[in-house]
Amino acid sequence: MTLTIKEVTQLINAVNTIEELENHECFLDERKGVQNAIARRRKALEKEQALKEKYVEMTYFENEILKEHPNAIICGIDEVGRGPLAGPVVACATILNSNHNYLGLDDSKKVPVTKRLELNEALKNEVTAFAYGIATAEEIDEFNIYKATQIAMQRAIDGLSVQPTHLLIDAMTLDNALPQVSLIKGDARSVSIAAASIMAKVFRDDYMTQLSKDYPEYGFEKNAGYGTKQHLLAIDDIGIMKEHRKSFEPIKSLL
């Protein structure tokens, strides 16, 4: 008895490798519906394979440390919120567990919101340790954004429940005695930094969404404090509030 296209599609969707797909008995079924199902499954498997290869590439710096220090406890550190006109800069320090596998990890700005939230939940539940560090708008104005970012990163490290032995940091160096590697675009090159990027992004977005409940005119739940048209118009109409960065333009010129 010939299987229906629906039944064949179910079999095809259970295939886990391209090689298995090409050797499957259904591969020779010439019905258009079957061939379409095969094409869809191939595309999905190719995408998954690309994510796996990307993930392996992004473990390079972790593996280099582990070659020399097999028992190393590696902490990835990243921040979000250097550019907005309002709100804190938020850093996250993340120590992945030894059997980590979070396909789709990348620079948080490149990850779709739904996937970002999914990864964030998995990371919070499964990593060895994580902690956030915040530098306020007042501290940004007092020290400058670069120094405030360093402060936020160190606070995140200090908040960890597990002491790391090595640091992987996105494009920054810290006044810290631990061995550290600073990576330009580290959130796209290291799984540890990418994990910290995701977690910091979700934390700060949530913070700004909560802030928008007290200050709805600025649209923080949509712009996260960046200088969008709505945000700038609100500044013109009602002025600034305590979490605006007074050292940033155009706010600085308004004071």
Swiss-Prot record:
Domain of life: Bacteria
Domain spans labelled RNase H type-2: 72-255
Matching InterPro entries: RNase_HII (IPR022898), RNase_HII/HIII (IPR001352), RNase_HII/HIII_dom (IPR024567), RNaseH-like_sf (IPR012337), RNaseH_sf (IPR036397)
UniProt keyword annotation of Hydrolase present: yes
Enzyme class per UniProt: hydrolase
Cofactor(s) listed: Mn(2+); Mg(2+)
Any one of the GO CC terms: cytoplasm
Keyword entries, A-Z: Cytoplasm, Endonuclease, Hydrolase, Manganese, Metal-binding, Nuclease
Reaction(s) catalysed by this chain's protein: Endonucleolytic cleavage to 5'-phosphomonoester
Residue numbers binding a divalent metal cation: 78-79, 170
Binding note for cofactor: Manganese or magnesium. Binds 1 divalent metal ion per monomer in the absence of substrate. May bind a second metal ion after substrate binding.
Pfam families per the UniProt record, alphabetical: RNase_HII
GO molecular function annotations of the record: manganese ion binding; RNA binding; RNA-DNA hybrid ribonuclease activity
Protein family according to the UniProt entry: Belongs to the RNase HII family.
Purpose: Endonuclease that specifically degrades the RNA of RNA-DNA hybrids.
Record-given protein name: Ribonuclease HII
Naturally occurring in which organism (per UniProt): Staphylococcus aureus (strain NCTC 8325 / PS 47)
Gene that encodes the chain: rnhB
